[in-house]
């Protein structure tokens, strides 16, 4: 079995997320998605985020047929522990995260960078909603 892993916030699930997750699953037989806890999202993106709490985000992802498992992480160290225990064959990252070699390169056999489809963005969706 070929294991694939991705991580992210996945706050307001949109087509860009879905395209990337579908692509990730096509790289193997089993897809693990690691998502930031609410505390971590607030730390990274501000007090008004996330829009959807971690349990709702986890539920949304688990409803997708191409996602097999979802784990929460609260720090980079916790993400590394997930990677160490899961030992992904493939780690899929957005191509906007190509800078240098990082954690994904250390704990997976292969890293594949995924180019975004369109200009989908949770931040843009929030801005469009609040500007109406």
Please name every model-derived segment.
Residues 1-132:
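Nucleotidyltransferase catalytic core that binds NTPs
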């Amino acid at each position: 079995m070929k294991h694939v892993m991705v991580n992210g916030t996945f706050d307001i699930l949109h087509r860009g997320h879905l395209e990337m997750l579908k692509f990730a699953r096509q790289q193997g037989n089993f897809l693990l998605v690691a998502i930031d806890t609410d505390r971590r999202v607030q730390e990274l993106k501000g007090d008004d985020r996330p829009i959807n709490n971690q349990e709702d985000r986890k539920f949304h992802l688990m409803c997708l047929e191409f996602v097999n498992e979802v784990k929460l992480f609260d720090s980079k160290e916790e993400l590394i522990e997930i990677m160490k225990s899961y030992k992904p064959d493939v780690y899929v990252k957005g191509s906007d995260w190509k800078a240098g070699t990082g954690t994904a390169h250390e704990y997976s056999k292969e890293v594949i960078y995924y180019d975004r489809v369109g200009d989908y963005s949770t931040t843009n969706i929030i801005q469009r909603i609040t500007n109406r």
